[in-house]
Amino acid sequence: MKNSVIIVDDQTLFAEGIKSILISTGNFIVKGIASSGLECLGLIDKNKPGLIIINSSIGEISGIDILKIIREHKMPIKILFISSEINVNVSIDALNYNVDGLILKNSSLSDFLSAINSILEDNQFIHPFILDAVNSYLAQTDNCKKTTLTKRETQILKIGLHNTPPFHSDQYPGSGQEEEIAF
C-alpha cells in the first residue's frame, strides 16, 4: 500500500522536486502540493493524508499552526517539518507539539528518505544539526535556571539595589550629576 502525502512549501520548484523524489520511490502517492497553510488545511480535509511534509516557515498560517490543529483534532497524520535554516524556537515549539520529524532543506537525499522512513515506522527523526542547536539552547537556559545565590550574595545584591539611585534620562556619566554611593 502506498503512503499518501501532501507537500506544503511556498517554493514551487522545491515542492515539485520533493514530489518527483517521492513518486520515483514507488512508495508514495502525492495527493497535493500547497503553497500556504490555508491551502494545506483544505487539502487535509479533502485527502486525509498519512504524511505531510511542510515548510516550517510558511505564511499566514504557519507550520506550527498546522501542527497544532492536527494534534488538537487527533488526526492520524505524520508531520515532517523541513526548513532552510535552524530556528531553535520553532524547533522547540514543534517538538512540544510532537512533530514527527525535523530536517533541513540542504540535507542529503538519503537523510531525507531516512527521515520519512523513520517517521512512517513511528520513530521521530531530528536532523543532527537541529538536535545540536536545540540541545545547546536548552543547556544554556538550564544553566540560567539553576543559578542560585548564596545568602551572602543575596544580602550584597539587596544592599546594592537599596543604595542605587533611580535612573533619570538626564543623568549620564560625566554630566557632573553623579552621586557617590557609600556601602
PLM feature spans:
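Active-site beta3 strand of CheY-like receiver
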Residues: 47-54, 58
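Recognition helix of helix-turn-helix DNA-binding domains
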Residues: 163-183
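Short, flexible helix-to-coil linker/hinge segments that flank and couple to helix-turn-helix
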Residues: 91-95, 100-147, 151, 155
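Acidic catalytic/metal-coordinating carboxylates
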Residues: 36, 62-65
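Short amphipathic alpha-helix used as the core "switch/output" element in two-component signaling
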Residues: 64-75
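Short hydrophobic/Thr-rich beta-strand motif most characteristic of the beta2 strand and flanking loop
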Residues: 27-35, 43
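Conserved acidic segment of CheY-like receiver
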Residues: 2-14, 18-22, 52, 149
